[in-house]
Amino acid sequence: MNRLLALSFSFLLSATALSSGNAPEHPAVLLEKVAVLLEKLTWDEAEPLLTPETIVVIPLGAGSKEHGRHLQLNNDFLMAEYFKRRVLRAAPPNVVIAPTINYGFYPAFLEYPGSTSVTLETARAMVNDIVRSLAHYGPRRFYILNTGISTLRPLALSAEDLAKDGILLRYLDFTKDDPVEKKLRRSGGTHADEVETSMMLYIAPETVQMKKAARDLNDNRPGGLTRDPKGKGTYSPTGAWGDPTLATKEKGQAIVESNVATILKDIEEVRHAALPALPPTAN
């Protein structure tokens, strides 16, 4: 994955050089034409890119969280990395993409081995610290390319915290109605379900084990998912909640492309949104 991202950035530099007949352009010049990956720069290349006009995109996807018996633990991370590549190719100028955060607030899945979560306050503080670190160099506009649902709660708190520092933070929200998803969905569910499995059949089909997919849609109860039929929360012996057997690559393609359009629209809205007021300067 990292090799692919490195090759993508190298290709952009090489293409620019070939079109001009000169050496590759400085990243600050390149940023005026395409989005760039922060992790592939040196600090002195990053310095001129991190300006008040820059939008910083930070992907967020769990690196180890259960997704039923048919999807990998790094499902959300793979999704975040995929959307990162799509933003890299299609985002407007002056967008810097930071490395993906692969830990977060996922308490609902801890009964399933391999799943990880940090506390709400840790998730909130982690985003705050990362954003403030980068804002120190100039940027005030940030977008979290979020692939989770439980992550929305700490992200909302972070947005409030950072606004007090004059920093704008917005994030992708998968709970908002998507007309394409609404049209294609045939069953309920919200986790490793028909929709998420369809997306992965399009994004990374080699990671999906459809032979192990099974309908698992018991009554939704307060709390997380549980393997115990008498336990608190929603009973799910598989770790999924929905019917992944209905998933298809074609549905996934339509839903993913709709999500990409939403992400790019969100980023453009971040570009033009009013910034929160800066705090008073201390005497």
Residue ranges and their predicted role:
Residues 6-16:
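Bacterial N-terminal signal peptides
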Residues 20-121, 125-142, 147-283:
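Extended, histidine- and acidic-residue-enriched regions that form the cofactor-binding/catalytic faces
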